[in-house]
Amino acid sequence: MTAPDPTGAPGARRGRTARRLIGWALGLVTVIAVAANQRDVGIARDEAVYMQNGARYADWWIGLVTFGHGISERSVTRTFGGPGATDNNREHPALMKTLFGLSERLVHRTLGVASEVTAFRLPSALGHGVLVVLVYFLVLELWGLAEAIAAALLVLLLPRAVFHAGLACFDAPTMTLWFATVAAYWRGLDGRRWPWQAGVLWGLALATKHTALLLPFALGVHYLIVGLVAARRARRARSESTGATPPRRALAAARAVIGYRWRVIVSLAVLGPLTLYLVWPWLWFDPVHHVQAWLAFHTSHVHYNYEYLGRNWNAPPF
């Protein structure tokens, strides 16, 4: 007769199941709330561009997987690129626009369960639900159930975020993928053998909006700090002599920091760009030139001034 496993007790299992259901229920409520709220929101200027091009992107992918056409530079350029800086909205990656188009084709044209505009906007709403679920489960792991519910509700009840999540645009999806990348990076610091999730999610964030290029700077600072702390602890545990010369100590510290969780760095550096490349057909032909054109467009983009709380902000970066 074996001793009972307390972690596998029926009560414990029911508790875990209940906590999971709470998280998924909060995500579902978020999607419903966003989908209901967006019905009273008019079409934003950018949405019209993303909807039009997203429908064409979706048709191209469907034609590809149904063998209606092959992969050629001509078909990719005609759908995703062109000689002009804004031809076929090539200045923005294709991921979310493609999802907008696929959603409209499935939910509106095929199933007929939502209006055309709602169907285009549904991927953003679903993404916001995913964000609430991710926040819930991360906080649940770190602090507990009450804190997780509070954190998820605070995200759900952000008015501006709910507004953006109801648009067929990139702002809400990129927020979700930023958080997902950070969460995957944090989990990768546990020393797992291959933290591929961080790289793939960062690649999807890049394929959503160019602002994801800033994410490694924030993660890099954090990695440097935790790596230095870990290196210092390891040195103390080994009772190493502090008599080494400063250059030797600096070199040892650099090796320790880089090697602390090096697989996370490799995941971001390799899988991130690779994922971006795979989901954006415009990069399949002449990728170096097209990436340069993509970045050049945004580094020299016209500045939009705006008024906030009675003040007119005219100078970048505001």
Residue ranges and their predicted role:
Residues M1-A33, V130-V133, L140, G227-L228, ...:
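Start-transfer (signal-anchor) and selected internal transmembrane alpha helices
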Residues R19-R20, W24, A114-S115, V135-L157, ...:
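Transmembrane-helix signature of polytopic, membrane-embedded enzymes
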Residues A44, F163-P173:
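Short acidic/glycine- and proline-prone juxtamembrane loop motifs at membrane-interface regions
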Residues Y50-N53, A58-G63, H92, T98, ...:
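Transmembrane-lumen/periplasm boundary regions of multi-pass, lipid-linked membrane glycan transferases
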Residues T118, L122-L142, A180, A184:
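Transmembrane-helix motifs of polytopic, lipid-linked glycan transferases
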Residues L142, T181-W196, A205, G227:
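Membrane-interface transmembrane helices that cradle and orient dolichyl/undecaprenyl
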Residues A151-L156, A183, W202, L206, ...:
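Short helix- or helix-capping micro-motifs
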Residues W196-A198, T211-A230:
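Transmembrane-embedded, aromatic-rich helix segments that form part
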